[in-house]
Structures are given as C-alpha cells and as structure tokens.
Amino acid sequence: MAEITAQLVKQLRDKTGAGMMDCKKALQETGGEMEKAIDWLRQKGLASAGKKAGRLTAEGLVDSYIHTGGRIGVLVEVNCETDFVARNEAFRSLVQDIAKQIAACPNVEYVSIDEIPPATVEREKAIAMGSDALKGKPENVKEKIVQGKMDKTLRELCLLDQPFIRDQSITVEELIKQAIAQLGENVKVRRFVRFVMGEGIEKEEANLAEEVAAQIAAKEAPPAVVEAPVAETPEPAVAETPEAKPAATESKPAKSKSAKKKK
C-alpha cells in the first residue's frame, strides 16, 4: 500500500475537484492508487462536487415534513443555483429526504460544525476536561482524549455529519455532494427548524406514592361530625297598649214641664 501523503491527496484533489477529506478517504479505500481513487470518487458522485462548492446559491426550496402522528414537524431551506434545478424532481426529493433526516435527529441543532458558537465549544471542552477518567493522566494524553470527545459531541449536533437515515454508509454531507454531481449545481442546506409538540411546556407530574397515601388517608379519616344548627327562640311580641280614650259624660235626662207643676 502506497503511503498516503498530503502531496498525493492534493494531486487527487486537483484532478477531481473533490474535497480534501474525500480525496484522502478515496486513497485509503484504494490503497493509494490514483486511478482507482478517481474511479472511487466518481462512483460516489464526489469527483466534481468540490469544484462547485464555492458557487452562489440564490434559488432553492423551503419544504416541510410532519412526522406520523403530528408530534414532530420540520421546516428546511435548501438552496441551489438556478430555478430550473429548484423545480427538478431529484432536487425536491433531496430536500424532502433532508427534512426527514432532521426529524429523525433530535440532537441536531446546526447545519455544520462551523456554525457552532464559540461559547458552546468552550462549554463542551470544560465538560470534557472535568471528566473523572482524566485524573492522573499526562497532559498530552488528556488533550487527545478531550479533543476526541469534543469532536464526537460537536458532530452529533451537526446535520451534515449525521449518517443518512436511508443509507448509513454515507453522511448527509456525502449525500449532498452526490446530488451536486448529479444536478450539476452547487447545493447547500441554509437553515432549518425542528418542532416537537409540547416542547418547552412543563407538565406537573403527579407523585404516585403521594397520591396513594392521600387516598388512604382520606378513607381512614373519621367522618366529620356535622352540628345541627340551633333554632333561635323568637322573642315574644310586645302588645301595643291602646291609647286611653276620654270617658263619656253621662247626661241627666231633662225633667219634663209636667213634673214641675205637680210640685
């Protein structure tokens, strides 16, 4: 097997336009033989993708995918160079595959590793450095272990580094490179958003033990004594005293004239 040097990788890149990592992998897969490496890249659809990587992508498609049951939804924007390709069925199928890929990857937050904020990188590094597994190890060994853990963690956050759900032998990045070779235009995933039903809403989870204890206590508690209301004795009614009326004056009967004469 020929030694795979940086110069050999550069030669393959100049001949094919493929990315440096793709060229290195092609040489590794073919034992360092240039012609076989070129054929390998062509079979993977990577031979011309690198030449188109820097071209402007101002057209494209915004597509959506709703997973069965409506619990997960995805919106994704994928760009290409021309409206002609944007209306191509192969391009539309690629965008739909990418949307499904995002739905299937709950940890993915960024398109590529270049988009990860420095603060996130530093936080992951601090977590890796604080691992108990590093205690007692030399500093140079620690650096290698930490770098390996960080690379793995950060790549899990990136869409392009995920194994393609329909073909685990390639990544999403390699899938896109194949599409570039097939369509003859540069293709880029610009942005995406993944929705999960109920995400961010805190649900109050009942404690089963506490709930059972409360039910038992309610059953064992003695029945509450309900006191009958005391009827109020009505106050006796006060009889009203009738107002005194003036006594009637008795009138004496008048004597008749005949009685006076007899005297």
UniProtKB/Swiss-Prot annotation:
Transmembrane segments: none annotated. GO terms for molecular function: translation elongation factor activity. InterPro entries: EF-Ts_dimer_sf, Transl_elong_EFTs/EF1B, Transl_elong_EFTs/EF1B_dimer, Transl_elong_Ts_CS, UBA-like_sf. Residues 254-263 have a biased composition (Basic residues). It is found in: Cytoplasm. Associates with the EF-Tu.GDP complex and induces the exchange of GDP to GTP. It remains bound to the aminoacyl-tRNA.EF-Tu.GTP complex up to the GTP hydrolysis stage on the ribosome. Belongs to the EF-Ts family. This is Elongation factor Ts. It comes from Cyanothece sp. (strain PCC 7425 / ATCC 29141). The lineage of its organism: Bacteria, Bacillati, Cyanobacteriota, Cyanophyceae, Gomontiellales.
